[in-house]
Amino acid sequence: MTDVAQGLLDTSVIIDHDIVDADRLPAQAGISAVTLAELSAGPHTTADPAERSRRQDRLQWAAATFEPYPLDADAARAYGRVVAAVRASGRRERSRVADLLVAATAVANDLPLFTRNPDDLAHLGDVVEVHAV
């Protein structure tokens, strides 16, 4: 396990959980309700029955494994800070709302964020601690 005791796993880590090195994850890991929402949408966004089944299995596993951190008022306020960091870096936030809401959930709960897409979140270094896995 990583030296970090607690952390929030973003959706990419949950999707790729089977291939992620467990030693790079925190001992106590959580997910955001936003991740659960993204996973819930997943089975409905593919026409391939085998892929739909895999996505449904991943959703059920995540729902049974994690108690999601809510997207509450603290996370909503933290989202403003996250968007400010995105804009300060010259990037646009519109197409990445779900990722940024997950990051805001990490900020609101004072947790580092673990992701498979660190380049997408590199500009948030002053707002949230990002760990690549």
Language-model-detected regions and their locations in the chain:
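PIN-domain endoribonuclease scaffold, especially VapC-family toxins
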Residues: T2-L8, H17-A104, A122-A132
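C-terminal structural segments of small proteins and small subunits
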Residues: A108-D120
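Short beta->alpha connector loops at strand-helix junctions that form conserved
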Residues: N117, A132-V133
